[in-house]
């Protein structure tokens, strides 16, 4: 009996020592600095296959721009700009919106970002949101022209002549350095109003005489999404809405190429959850935001934003209602489902007057 007790005690001792050793091993190999949560920028299409960063789902580290950095401690900092950045940070953390708020920092994104090395500025292009005027500002800053008035309209979007390099043209190290240290900004507007502007500009008026929108893209959308196949009218906004709200539109997007930049989401264009922007301007308050951005970038003494015609940046609910009139609630809800991330990231009110 005495031997049985000794044997039992020995077994308990072995088990106890094993548990202590396991705990010690766990503590020894635990990552003390939390490197498992270290954030990285993802470059999938610009780097060789072996250099792709796989599986990263974390948020980027806070960069340290060489220009003026937004800070909660600055007494002269208008709270609206801090609130916008805080809203983006909080929305990026919402797991339910991850598929609508996150994207890889791919070549498509890097192609949208224009570089001014002289003044350490990055500008992410968001078409139909005063993008042309901001490109003119950067063209002057880069030294291609001495004033905005001298820039020919046909040069602004000619990237072989306007002197604006894209971020994608730099090495991986050069890209990362600029993303971490430069002043970065982009402009947004109400997502649905932007889609209306894109439709009017590319399929109705087409002031730059870009025939591929009417002759190639429009017919492709009509063939796929028009309900009444006997109707011979050109593309209608209803066709456009069905295309944009279709979860299976990807094959058409691939055919349309980079022309889709005029209507894809801000998330797809600028990756706001992956890149820590210094300022996000709003088209609706551009009269105040443009001078503020120039000041924060440290260039307000060098260039001015072109004069903004009165009322042109105001949100026009009546126009939005008119364009969506007659479009089914199902199609509008599908459209909102795609752009919900943009609405929530940038604080735009859900358009219940269209959805309900």
Swiss-Prot record:
Subcellular localization: Golgi apparatus membrane
Segments on the Lumenal face: 28-356
Pathway(s) per entry: Steroid metabolism; Protein modification; carbohydrate sulfation
Residue ranges, Cytoplasmic side: 1-6
EC number annotated for this UniProt entry: 2.8.2.-
GO BP of this protein: androgen metabolic process; carbohydrate biosynthetic process; estrogen metabolic process; learning; long-term memory
Keywords from the named record: Carbohydrate metabolism, Glycoprotein, Golgi apparatus, Lipid metabolism, Membrane, Signal-anchor, Steroid metabolism, Transferase, Transmembrane, Transmembrane helix
Residues annotated as transmembrane: 7-27
Ligand binding (3'-phosphoadenylyl sulfate): 127-133, 189-197
Membrane topology value: Single-pass type II membrane protein
Catalytic activity: 3-O-{beta-D-GlcA-(1->[3)-alpha-D-Xyl-(1->3)-beta-D-GlcA-(1->](n)-4)-beta-D-Xyl-(1->4)-Rib-ol-P-Rib-ol-P-3-beta-D-GalNAc-(1->3)-beta-D-GlcNAc-(1->4)-O-6-P-alpha-D-Man}-L-Thr-[protein] + 3'-phosphoadenylyl sulfate = 3-O-{O-3-S-beta-D-GlcA-(1->[3)-alpha-D-Xyl-(1->3)-beta-D-GlcA-(1->](n)-4)-beta-D-Xyl-(1->4)-Rib-ol-P-Rib-ol-P-3-beta-D-GalNAc-(1->3)-beta-D-GlcNAc-(1->4)-O-6-P-alpha-D-Man}-L-Thr-[protein] + adenosine 3',5'-bisphosphate + H(+); 17beta-estradiol 3-O-(beta-D-glucuronate) + 3'-phosphoadenylyl sulfate = 17beta-estradiol 3-O-(3-sulfo-beta-D-glucuronate) + adenosine 3',5'-bisphosphate + H(+); 17beta-estradiol 3-O-(beta-D-glucuronate) 17-sulfate + 3'-phosphoadenylyl sulfate = 17beta-estradiol 3-O-(3-sulfo-beta-D-glucuronate) 17-sulfate + adenosine 3',5'-bisphosphate + H(+); 17beta-estradiol 17-O-(beta-D-glucuronate) + 3'-phosphoadenylyl sulfate = 17beta-estradiol 17-O-(3-sulfo-beta-D-glucuronate) + adenosine 3',5'-bisphosphate + H(+)
GO cellular component terms, A-Z: Golgi membrane
Residues modified by glycosylation: 99, 228, 316
InterPro entries according to UniProt: Carb_sulfotrans_8-10, Sulfotransferase
Xref: Pfam families: Sulfotransfer_2
GO MF term list: sulfotransferase activity
Disruption phenotype: Mice are viable, fertile and show normal cerebellar granule neuron migration. The anatomy of all major brain areas are histologically normal. However, basal synaptic transmission in pyramidal cells in the CA1 region of the hippocampus are increased and long-term potentiation evoked by theta-burst stimulation are reduced. Mice show an impaired long-term memory and a poorer spatial learning when a short inter-trial interval is used.
Family: Belongs to the sulfotransferase 2 family.
The protein's role, per its UniProt record: Catalyzes the transfer of sulfate from 3'-phosphoadenylyl sulfate (PAPS) to position 3 of terminal glucuronic acid of both protein- and lipid-linked oligosaccharides. Participates in biosynthesis of HNK-1 carbohydrate structure 3-O-sulfo-beta-D-GlcA-(1->3)-beta-D-Gal-(1->4)-D-GlcNAc-R, a sulfated glucuronyl-lactosaminyl residue carried by many neural recognition molecules, which is involved in cell interactions during ontogenetic development and in synaptic plasticity in the adult. May be indirectly involved in synapse plasticity of the hippocampus, via its role in HNK-1 biosynthesis.
Protein name, as recorded: Carbohydrate sulfotransferase 10
Organism field: Mus musculus
């Amino acid at each position: 009996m005495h031997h049985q007790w000794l044997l039992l005690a020995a077994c308990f001792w072995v088990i106890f020592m094993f548990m202590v050793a396991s705990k010690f091993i766990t503590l020894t190999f635990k990552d003390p600095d939390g490197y498992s949560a270290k954030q990285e920028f993802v470059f999938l299409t610009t780097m060789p296959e072996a250099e792709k960063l796989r599986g990263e789902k974390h948020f980027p580290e806070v960069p340290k721009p060489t220009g003026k950095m937004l800070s909660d401690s600055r007494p002269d900092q208008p709270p609206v700009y801090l609130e916008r950045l805080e809203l983006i940070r909080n929305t990026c953390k919402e797991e339910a919106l991850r598929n609508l708020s996150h994207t890889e920092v791919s070549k498509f994104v890097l192609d949208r970002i224009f570089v001014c090395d002289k003044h350490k500025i990055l500008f992410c292009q968001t078409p139909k949101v005063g993008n042309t005027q901001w490109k003119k500002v950067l063209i002057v800053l880069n030294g291609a022209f001495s004033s905005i008035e001298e820039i020919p309209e046909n040069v602004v979007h000619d990237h072989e002549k306007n002197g604006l390099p894209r971020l994608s043209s730099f090495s991986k190290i050069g890209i990362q350095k600029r993303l971490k240290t430069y002043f970065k900004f982009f402009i947004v507007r109400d997502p649905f109003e932007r889609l209306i502007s894109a439709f009017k500009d590319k399929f109705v008026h087409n002031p730059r005489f870009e025939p591929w929108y009417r002759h190639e893209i429009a017919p492709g959308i009509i063939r796929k999404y028009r309900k009444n196949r006997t109707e011979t009218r050109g593309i209608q906004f209803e066709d456009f809405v069905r295309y944009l709200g279709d979860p299976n539109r990807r094959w058409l997007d691939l055919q349309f190429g980079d022309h889709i930049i005029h209507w894809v989401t801000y998330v797809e264009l600028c990756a706001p959850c992956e890149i820590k922007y210094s300022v996000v301007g709003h088209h609706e308050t551009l009269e105040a935001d443009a001078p503020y951005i120039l000041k924060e970038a440290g260039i307000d003494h060098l260039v001015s934003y072109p004069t903004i015609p009165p009322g042109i940046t105001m949100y026009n609910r009546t126009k939005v209602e008119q364009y969506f009139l007659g479009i089914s609630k199902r199609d509008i809800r599908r459209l909102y489902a795609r752009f919900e991330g943009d609405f929530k990231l940038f604080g735009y009110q859900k358009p219940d007057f269209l959805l309900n």
